[in-house]
Amino acid sequence: MLELNNKKNIAILFSGGVESTLLYYLTLKQTSSETNIKLFIIDRDNNPIERAFDLYNKLKILWNDTRTSLHILLIPETIPSHKKISNALNILNQEHDCVILGLNKYPSKKSIRPKLKGNTFNNTSILKMLNKFENLILPFIDLQKNQIIQMYYDYDIKEILQMTHSCGSPELKPCKICFNCRERIWAYNKLDKPLELGV
C-alpha cells in the first residue's frame, strides 16, 4: 500500500485518528530500521494534542517502537483552521523525503457528507492544492472510512480502534453528531460490526 522504498526521512501528519494511526502502523512495518520517521501533530478545533500523545505513547510501547518520535508542529494562530494542513505541508515538504497524510474519501451516503461535498476529491480545490506537494503520499485518497477500518481487522490490530480519536468537537467524549462521528458510525454500520467510537 505504501511505496516507501528509498525513503529515508519520512513525516506523518498524526492526529490520533483512524487514518493517521493506521499510517503510523503501516509505515513502521514497511520501512527498515535505518528509516527516520517523525510524526507531527497540529492543534485544531477538537484539541487533539493531548489525546494523540497519549495514544502515541501507548502504541510506542505496544509496538516496541524505538524509531519514531512525535512533535507538535506550531502553526501561527492567525492561520485559519481550513488552511492549517496546507501550511503544515509547506513546512514538512521541504524537510522530508515524503509526507504521508491520511485524507480519505467522504461517505457514499450524501446525508453523511459535509454540505455540498462530493465523495471524491477529483478536480476539487483541495486536490489541486495537495498536488503541488511533490513529496506527498495520500494512500487513502480513494478509500472510504469503512475500508480503512476493515484494514484494522485485516492486520489484526482492531483493538487499537477503541484508542483512536475521531470526534471533531472539543468535547471530552465523542459527541456522536459531528461529521467525524457520523462518518465513523456510518462506516461501522456498513461493515456490520459493533460500533467503536473511540475516545
Language-model features: where?
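Nucleotide-activated chemistry modules centered on ATP-dependent adenylation/adenylyltransferase
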Residues: 1-199
